[in-house]
């Protein structure tokens, strides 16, 4: 879809969720777990080249068959510390608390609500994409927003996380939005413009 960005087919092991590959130097990132197929492994090995990418998990909803994927690739995994206990057998597992910056300058922010350890990843310009996991989900073509689902961990913390995220994003940037949820409601679109971020309901 872009020379630096790749999207994988929906992952049935993640309730139809979406994983992304962002090609940045010196450390590319795989965001959430794609379907673990031979085609996926061939692509990821070719895309990585002689680099060691990092696998970033935006929530427990994006784990899929992560153990099998890491066994094949031997890449380190980064997860918010609240959900590290769900991955006891991984060989290379790093955690963060409130925020984290990768070697490539990608910024992570803890955004609890959808799950206890939900987080987002901001790729600053020139990539200029916000990978928002399940915090923002498709509402319709060109539109992402926050919705309460049966699996939502804490609705009011989710609303607070969305408000905090708005303040955290640098005002001079308007990143495109990449959701980790199922994208069917976007009707063929993949990225959503920043203007398509629908405000959440009031906290009051």
Describe the role of every protein-language-model region:
Residues 13-15, 93-94, 112-116:
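Short solvent-exposed loop/turn micro-motifs enriched in small/polar/acidic residues
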Residues 34-105, 196, 200:
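Active-site HxH/HxHxD metal-binding segment of metal-dependent hydrolases
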Residues 1-27, 42, 73, 164, ...:
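Zn-dependent metallo-beta-lactamase
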Residues 11-12, 20-21, 99-100, 122, ...:
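Short secondary-structure boundary/capping segments
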